[in-house]
């Protein structure tokens, strides 16, 4: 009689939170670039260079950008952004629905509401 051994290997997807954290770190440390046009024998060529020479140049694995993101705090009819003014925010949240982030440093008004509703309770 003989013995049989089976090994199975596969790649597992990392935890979704870990992926999000990784991408957020990349976003927070992204390098701003400048598009430069110069003439070569084959015509005009565009290249990217770091906007600030004081910082080390980005690697192939770094995130880079050459246009700033729109200001999501203020309305912009051209891009269809409504801004965040008069949005409801969560005072106790540190997430994207929190007042600190959603109100863009403008401050917020707190409103307390009392409502009377029929609850259709049966005792």
Curated annotation (Swiss-Prot):
UniProt superkingdom: Eukaryota
Coiled coil: none
Main localization, broad class: secreted
Molecular function (Gene Ontology), one example: cytokine activity
Disulphide-bridged cysteine pairs: 89-104
GO biological process per UniProt: canonical Wnt signaling pathway; cell fate commitment; neuron differentiation
Lipidation (O-palmitoleoyl serine): 1
Family annotation (SMART domains): WNT1
PTM statement from Swiss-Prot or TrEMBL: Palmitoleoylation is required for efficient binding to frizzled receptors. Depalmitoleoylation leads to Wnt signaling pathway inhibition.
Cited InterPro entries: Wnt, Wnt_C
Glycosylation sites: 90
Entry similarity comment: Belongs to the Wnt family.
UniProt name for this protein: Protein Wnt-3b
Native source species: Meleagris gallopavo
Gene coding for it: WNT3B
